[in-house]
From Swiss-Prot:
GO terms for cellular component: nucleus. This is Zinc finger protein 385D. GO terms for molecular function: sequence-specific double-stranded DNA binding; zinc ion binding. Keywords: Metal-binding, Nucleus, Repeat, Zinc, Zinc-finger. The gene is Znf385d. Residues 282-308 are annotated as: Disordered. It is found in: Nucleus. Its main location: nucleus. SUPFAM superfamilies: beta-beta-alpha zinc fingers. A zinc finger (Matrin-type) spans 80-110, 204-234, 267-297.
Length: 395
């Protein structure tokens, strides 16, 4: 009964037909779409599964985040930048190195100088405004005073205002004239009054030698040097270096303001006997060791040459041959033996020639006895060679 009642109760419920019907066939997904299973997780619940999650390494946190989808806390990167140089840095050390560098210091100095210039300009503008207000104050005060008078004095008030305006215009015109005159006088008087030495001290530059210095002491040391003095002597023509005008260069080209008086000239150094054609060559010669040694009195160094005339005069290389005027004796009586000399003398006596050579019997070349004829004959043998007569001579 219980089972029947149970089934009967269930059959009477309206939800039963829905359970009894067979399920609909599932839809076949397409080949391109892959089925994904949703895996919703509560982040707080899953973090509780890993009690040491906050103490884990960053790599382990990244793996868990990739697997379970934990959102890692995103830290905002601190941006370090320099607004003056328009640069961004990755770390504090880079920023500190930039702030200590020369590039940042130069830009900061330029910015400060611009600010100072702007301040000076604003100060000048404020001074001009105060000056104009001072000049206009008498007019306003006079007008205020005249406004307080009665209506019968209108003509006198207008006359006073005209007079005051004329006075102010005269004052302003006189001031402008005095300023322009002072400026013109200053411009006209400054070039002739400023000498070359004063200009060099002001600019820290020697226009004669074309040398720039950093202080007045360096300029004095340069002026007391030998190079500057020799250049002055060359310009004045009072020293050992003489200046001569270059041929064909008169009246050519405009005259420069920084003319040193040494352009378009040739120079001759009397100490070294050297001619140069320009100012730069003169400077090079003055700074050379040769000129310095000659100016200090040192003897010139001998140049290497295989054909030096001085060495030839002191140490002759050749051998002088002296020829006597007397005729030399003939060599034949000395070379030939005594019998030949005797035969020649006998022939001369036989001819009875007045120009016969009478020679004293000379000693033989070899003091030994004459060779026996047996040695001069060829040795016996099957081969016989004809021997020429042997003549002994010292050469």
């Amino acid at each position: 009964m219980r089972k029947i009642m149970y089934f009967g109760g269930t059959c009477q419920s309206p939800a039963l037909p829905a359970l009894i019907h067979p399920p609909a066939p599932p839809l076949q997904p397409s080949l391109d779409i892959k089925p994904f299973l949703p895996f919703p997780l509560d982040t707080a619940a899953t973090v509780n599964l890993f009690p040491n999650f906050n103490a884990m390494d960053p790599i382990q946190k990244a793996v868990i985040n990739h697997t379970f989808g934990f959102p890692l806390p995103h830290r905002k990167k601190q941006i370090i930048s320099c607004n003056i140089c328009q640069l961004r840095f990755n770390s504090d050390s880079q920023a500190a190195a930039h702030y200590k560098g020369t590039k940042h210091a130069k830009k900061l100095k330029a910015l400060e100088s611009m600010k100072n210039k702007q301040k000076s300009v604003t100060a000048k503008d404020s001074a001009k405004t105060t000056f104009t207000s001072i000049t206009t104050n008498p007019i306003t005060t006079s007008s205020d005073k005249t406004e307080s008078t009665a209506g019968t004095q209108v003509i006198a008030r207008s006359a006073d205002m005209r007079k005051s305006s004329e006075v102010t215009t005269e004052l302003t015109s006189n001031a402008e004239k005095s300023l322009t005159a002072a400026v013109a006088a200053g411009n006209n008087s400054s070039p002739p009054t400023e000498t070359e030495e004063e200009k060099a001290k002001r600019l820290l530059y020697c226009s004669l030698c074309k040398v720039a210095v950093n202080s007045a002491s360096q300029l004095e040391a340069h002026n007391s040097g030998t190079k500057h003095k020799t250049m002055l002597e060359a310009r004045n023509g009072s020293g050992t270096i003489k200046a001569f005008p270059r041929a064909g260069m008169k009246g050519k080209g405009p005259v420069n303001k920084g003319n040193t008086g040494l352009q378009n000239k040739t120079f001759h150094c009397e100490i070294c006997d050297v001619h140069v054609n320009s100012e730069t060559q003169l400077k090079q010669h003055i700074s050379s060791r040769r000129h310095k040694d000659r100016a200090s009195g040192k003897p010139p160094k001998p140049k290497y040459s295989p054909y030096n005339k001085l060495q030839k005069a002191a140490h002759p290389l050749g051998v002088k041959l002296v020829f006597s005027k007397e005729p030399s004796k003939p060599l034949t009586p000395r070379i030939l033996p005594n019998p030949l000399a005797a035969a020649a003398a006998a022939a001369a006596v036989a001819v009875n020639s007045p120009f016969s050579l009478r020679t004293a019997p000379a000693a033989t070349l070899f003091q030994t006895s004459a060779l026996p004829p047996a040695l001069l004959r060829p040795a016996p043998g099957p081969i016989r060679t004809t021997h020429t007569p042997v003549l002994f001579s010292p050469y």
